[in-house]
From Swiss-Prot:
It is found in: Cytoplasm; Nucleus. It comes from Danio rerio (Zebrafish). The keyword Protein transport does not apply. The keyword Zinc-finger does not apply. This is EEF1A lysine methyltransferase 2. InterPro entries: Efm4/METTL10, Methyltranfer_dom, SAM-dependent_MTases_sf. It catalyses: L-lysyl-[protein] + 3 S-adenosyl-L-methionine = N(6),N(6),N(6)-trimethyl-L-lysyl-[protein] + 3 S-adenosyl-L-homocysteine + 3 H(+). GO terms for cellular component: cytoplasm; nucleus. Keywords: Cytoplasm, Methyltransferase, Nucleus, S-adenosyl-L-methionine, Transferase. Transmembrane segments: none annotated. It holds the Pfam family Methyltransf_31. Protein-lysine methyltransferase that selectively catalyzes the trimethylation of EEF1A at 'Lys-318'.
Amino acid sequence: MNSSVSTHGTGDCPVNCTKSEDFAPSKLGTKEYWDGAYKRELQTYKDIGDVGEIWFGEESMHRVIRWMEAQNISENAAILDIGTGNGMFLVELARHGFSNLTGIDYSKAALELTTNILVEEGLKNINIQVEDFLNPSTELKGFDVCIDKGTFDAISLNPEDREEAKKHYVTSLRAVMRPNGFFIITSCNWTKEQLLEIFKPGFELVRELPTPNFQFGGVTGNSVTALVFKQTD
């Protein structure tokens, strides 16, 4: 069975996109929702080999990897995919020669899907583990590059206490990264200015990665924001 990429929703944000501080909490911010979603995707993969959605489309992976290659990030750099989902970003990183890869997710169903895909792709040396990033294990540390493509968006929809969840996320991020490490985030719920404010403690902006523009009512904007931060302390 050859893995195939889903043709549905690959360019869309999967987590209730709206660039506003006032977006409402949602079931999309719950573990139960993602467990159910990945159980369905796992069954679909077993049935027809469809890996499921590539969050924000395949270009969202390529723009991050282009930046990493332009910065001469070592192929041996320790890279963490936060909320790896189906693991396709890990697959793409491996295809580009990166060899020290870790993917985490709090959904066991997601990691079962990831495991199936990695086996099919013949990738044996990628580390995947169940982790709640808001309360990570002490062993999760020492990463040169951390990548988030939609996970912070989902966490921001937590119906219980999203403000605390955001703070815990930043704390966890600082704990797992090496000094001067890079954090690359792709978001459709937060603007550049909002992300700068959220990650101001301990991070500085290195680069805004180009994303597709849209025009509506004579106004030009971006539906997706992609930023590279560097840890400063």
